Each structure stands twice: as structure tokens, then as C-alpha cells.
């Protein structure tokens, strides 16, 4: 039997959590498909990536400089990539996303948290990104 496994935001909040996910997935060979949320809070004073993406969209909508919000989002994904030693060119994809921010709807912007997290998780697990 094949299993689909879903991990929420706190389960993918940082590289340490990614390692726990990998251990869980590898413990059961029937876990062939993994679905991830956007990274959640790393601690009580932290921000969820989804919340930051909503804030990024609000800045875009009201023509306010969003670069500081973007840097927080970008850094979180880069930190995960770096700590896990991944090769995924996530920086380039993130920068392209930010450059083209005005071409996206709110739903597209907010969905990038799951998208970028899934890209990193797929590489980390050695799975195909679908």
C-alpha cells in the first residue's frame, strides 16, 4: 500500500524539522508521496512564512516597499537549504518570484510558501518534485 504523508508548517519550520521529516518518511518505505506546508514558526516570536507572504502581498497591493519582508522570506529558505547542504537553486527562483511579484494574484503569492518548501524537501528526500 502506498501512503501519502502530509507535514504541516511546524514540521518543516527549519532544517532540524526537515531532518525529523526525513526520518519519519524513511522509517516506512510505503510513504512514497510527501506533501508539505509552508514553513511555520520556529519559536513563539517567529513568523509563519504564509503570514509573511500575505504581508508581502499587502505591501504589493498598497505600493509599499516590500524588500524587508521579502528578505525574511528569502532568508528562511536559504537557511534551510544551506543547513541541509542542498544544491537547489532556490535563491534564483525566489528572486525571480520577487521580481515578478506584480504579475501574481494573492493566491499565487501565498502558495509560494508550499512550493518553495516542496522544492527543498523533494531534493532532501531524493524524491521527484511534482
Model-derived segments and spans:
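Nucleotide/pyrophosphate-binding catalytic subdomain
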Residues: 1-130
Amino acid at each position: 500500500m502506498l501512503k501519502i504523508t502530509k507535514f504541516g508548517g511546524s514540521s518543516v519550520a527549519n532544517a532540524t524539522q526537515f531532518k525529523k521529516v526525513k526520518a519519519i518518511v524513511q522509517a516506512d518505505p510505503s510513504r512514497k508521496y510527501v506533501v508539505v506546508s509552508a514553513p511555520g514558526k520556529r519559536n513563539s516570536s517567529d513568523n509563519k512564512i504564509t503570514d509573511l507572504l500575505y504581508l508581502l502581498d499587502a505591501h504589493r497591493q498598497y505600493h509599499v516597499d516590500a524588500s524587508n519582508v521579502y528578505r525574511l522570506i528569502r532568508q528562511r529558505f536559504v537557511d534551510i537549504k544551506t543547513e541541509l547542504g542542498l544544491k537547489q537553486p532556490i535563491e534564483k527562483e525566489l528572486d525571480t518570484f520577487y521580481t515578478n511579484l506584480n504579475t501574481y494574484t494573492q493566491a499565487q503569492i501565498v502558495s509560494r510558501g508550499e512550493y518553495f518548501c516542496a522544492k527543498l524537501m523533494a531534493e532532501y528526500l531524493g524524491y521527484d518534485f511534482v
